[in-house]
Amino acid sequence: MQQNKAQKVIEEVKKAFIGKTECVEKLMTAILAGGHVLVEDVPGVGKTTLALAFAKAMNVAQNRVQFTPDVLPADITGFTVYNREKDGFFYRPGAVMCNILLADEINRTSPKTQAALLEVMEEGSVTVDGATRPVPSPFLVIATQNPVGSAGTQLLPQSQLDRFLICFGIGYPDAAEEMDILKSRRSGNGLEDVRPVISSQELMEMKKEVEEVFVHDQVYDYIVRLAQATRNNDALELGLSPRGSLALLKMAQARAYRKGRSFVIPADVAAEFQDVAAHRVQSVSSSGMDRVRAAAVLERILKETPAPAPEKG
């Protein structure tokens, strides 16, 4: 197993992203699991720096799109143009033709442009003028968004939220972390200190090893019971989808791998439950506090759903 390489990436990213080590670990786990990530928080806490540092540490091709109201779907997927000299049409690649797409402030653009990401996030390909083109492998979308209610923001559709493997916030640094940021960021943003430590091929190999992490039937049952509990809870009008259950499984496998284990334990599932489920479920309230209420319900579900006991032997 090559999980030590994942730790090298984490240590490299921390050169640019100071504090909040758990956020770096969450993103690394999601990358190993092969899913897309949504980072939601207020401006200025390091969302973009975190994403750019990962792209640099993994030495992969990355594009960044600042999602504003005037960004068009063709900017994302690409488009065909006519070449008069060759008397034919050719494809001009869009932003998705990379390994890591940083979709900055994704909830500030139009729903039509947001929808342009749907196919590529799920299928790993784009269709332009009837022709389907695969994106490079590996492919990952790291999207950032400001909290709903901020000026110029709008809700992402549930169908798009469900395509993000996890969603998490960063939060403000504590006093010691903020002191470190001030001392180390008087000039530059720290990204110049980040060096490539793995290749895209090594990342693909690690992802394959994650898929081979063993999952006991009792752990499968635990995931199903958690998912069923979200669907049968009166406080939630939208429970965890089967895609969400699969996301929880993948994140648990990736966490076990990163911790140096070849098997999943219930603690892996419990540790990833909130980040996988909070953006997928919906409470009966439709107010701006919906996500907060849903998180509280999920925490209660986690406490009330018994984890499988370790086997004796």
PLM segments and residue spans:
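Dynamic helix-loop-helix/coil hinge segments at AAA+ ATPase domain boundaries and subdomain interfaces
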Residues: 1-23, 212-214
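Conserved alpha-helical scaffold flanking the Walker A/P-loop in AAA+ ATPase domains
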Residues: 25-29, 82-102
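Walker A/P-loop
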Residues: 31-68
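Walker B catalytic acidic pair
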Residues: 41, 104-105, 116
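P-loop (Walker A) phosphate-binding loop of NTP-binding proteins
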Residues: 42, 76, 144
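AAA+/P-loop NTPase substrate/partner-engagement loops
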Residues: 57-85
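Canonical AAA+ ATPase core
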Residues: 83-88, 109, 113, 121-213, ...
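C-terminal engagement/docking regions of AAA+ P-loop ATPases
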Residues: 232-313
